[in-house]
């Protein structure tokens, strides 16, 4: 018995959660299950590997080589030296081990590490932009379901009104005030309402399936989406991830500029080597140890420096142009959305009055039909008008909330 109670306690919250979803929960699940999210970890791994490899440039670099050499006479051996037993050979086999250690590299390794970090940041921000677009797609599907829910609700209310009207007309038919064609006219409207309801429910199921793919969850037709709270933004300052992406691009260009500067400096290395070789002459030993410092300065970077700097400046201008274009287009979208919000608020005020007047006209029409002073078709027209007015008001309410969230998404607040 205890086991059954425990199972029920575990399953019931899952069932309740499955029957109700919020917009924020859908966004979070969509981000967590989006295939591209795995790229974050891959970018970090690539960055860490690159940084680790760059740091290893400070480790001693060991090389080994074996060679065989043939050469002309190294020494001018005269007859007297030959009589003393001094001879030279024209071949030599040798093996060498050499160790090099960076002492000063002009900042090249540090610049490489900065570039690795900057490149990873650019990739991170680029991925954040694509992930941010995902939120808007989820919002559109979510509000699409809410809009269909409102339409289904009003279609069901229309069916109830038509059902009451049919009972009224059938009673009038028994009293001789109405005929069978009046009953049939109401029946036709009922069938039209059923047909509309089937189409709306099918569209809702399709939207739920698409939303389920984004959040990686199978959504049944029984699931209920909670209406988000209408929000008002206090500021219109833009915090979109695109701006962070452009900033990351500029940081990468600055890191590349520092790398160009590091190529202008000389490098200093310490070295040590050990050589073992066959004797060319008896005056030489078979082995040798050596050590010292090497100062080198490659001026080849000066040849291309001017063009390299110009190239970086052009790329910086491209980033600035892209940022300005994005902000301009974003401002247009924000202005358009704010205009829609203002329009919908005005329409909602008028929608309430339209619904009130339509309901009054319908009530009077129903009384006239009972008195026989108005046709059933006129009454049906007024009933449909009430349904359309109610549906239009609900549509505007949902569109207003959607527009407010769209504005929030456009400026990322």
Language model segments and positions:
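Bacterial Sec-dependent N-terminal signal peptides
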Residues: 1-34, 407, 411-413
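Start-of-domain marker
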Residues: 20-74
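Periplasmic alpha-helical coiled-coil/stalk elements that build and connect Gram-negative outer-membrane
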Residues: 25, 49, 130-244, 251, ...
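Small/polar (Gly/Ser/Thr/Ala-rich) solvent-exposed segments
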Residues: 38, 61-81, 89, 100-129, ...
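Amphipathic alpha-helical coiled-coil segments
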Residues: 39-54, 130, 134-153, 171, ...
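Transmembrane beta-barrel architecture of outer-membrane proteins
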Residues: 92-94, 140, 185, 267, ...
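Membrane-embedded beta-strands of outer-membrane beta-barrel proteins
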Residues: 97-99, 258, 293
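Acidic, glycine-rich loop-and-beta core segments that form the ion-binding/anion-interacting portion
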Residues: 232-277
């Amino acid at each position: 018995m205890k086991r059954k109670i425990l199972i029920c306690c575990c399953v019931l919250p899952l069932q309740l959660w499955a029957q109700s979803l919020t917009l924020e929960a859908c966004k979070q699940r969509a981000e967590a299950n989006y295939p591209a999210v795995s790229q974050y970890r891959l970018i970090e791994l690539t960055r860490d590997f690159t940084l680790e490899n760059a740091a290893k440039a400070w480790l001693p670099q060991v090389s080994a080589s074996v060679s065989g050499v043939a050469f002309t006479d190294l020494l001018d051996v005269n007859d007297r030296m030959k009589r003393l037993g001094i001879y030279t050979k024209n071949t030599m086999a040798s093996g060498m081990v050499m160790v090099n250690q960076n002492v000063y590299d002009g900042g090249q390794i540090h610049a490489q590490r900065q570039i690795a970090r900057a490149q990873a940041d650019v990739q991170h921000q680029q991925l954040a932009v694509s992930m941010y677009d995902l939120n808007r797609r989820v919002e559109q599907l979510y509000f699409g379901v809410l809009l269909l829910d409102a339409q289904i609700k009003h279609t069901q209310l229309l069916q109830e009104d038509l059902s009451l009207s049919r009972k009224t007309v059938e009673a009038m038919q028994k009293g001789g005030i109405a005929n069978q064609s009046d009953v049939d006219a109401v029946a036709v409207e009922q069938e039209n309402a059923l047909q509309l309801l089937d189409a709306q429910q099918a569209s809702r199921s399709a939207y739920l399936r698409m939303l389920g793919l984004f959040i990686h969850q199978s959504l049944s037709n029984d699931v209920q989406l909670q209406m988000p709270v209408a929000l008002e933004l206090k500021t219109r300052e833009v915090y979109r991830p695109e701006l962070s992406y452009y900033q990351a691009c500029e940081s990468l260009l600055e890191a590349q500029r520092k790398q160009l500067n590091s190529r202008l400096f000389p490098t200093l290395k310490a070295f040590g080597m050990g050589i073992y070789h066959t004797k060319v002459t008896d005056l030489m030993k078979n082995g040798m140890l050596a050590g010292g410092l090497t100062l080198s300065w490659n001026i080849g970077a000066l040849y291309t420096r001017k063009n390299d700097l110009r190239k970086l400046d052009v790329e910086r201008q491209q980033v600035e142009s892209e940022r300005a274009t994005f902000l301009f287009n974003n401002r247009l979208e924000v202005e358009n959305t704010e205009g829609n919000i203002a329009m919908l608020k005005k329409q909602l005020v008028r929608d309430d009055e339209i619904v009130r007047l339509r309901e009054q006209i319908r009530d009077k029409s129903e009384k006239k039909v009972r008195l026989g002073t108005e046709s059933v078709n006129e009454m049906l027209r007024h009933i449909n008008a009430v349904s359309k007015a109610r549906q239009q008001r609900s549509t505007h309410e949902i569109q207003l909330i959607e527009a407010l969230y769209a504005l929030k998404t456009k400026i990322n607040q």
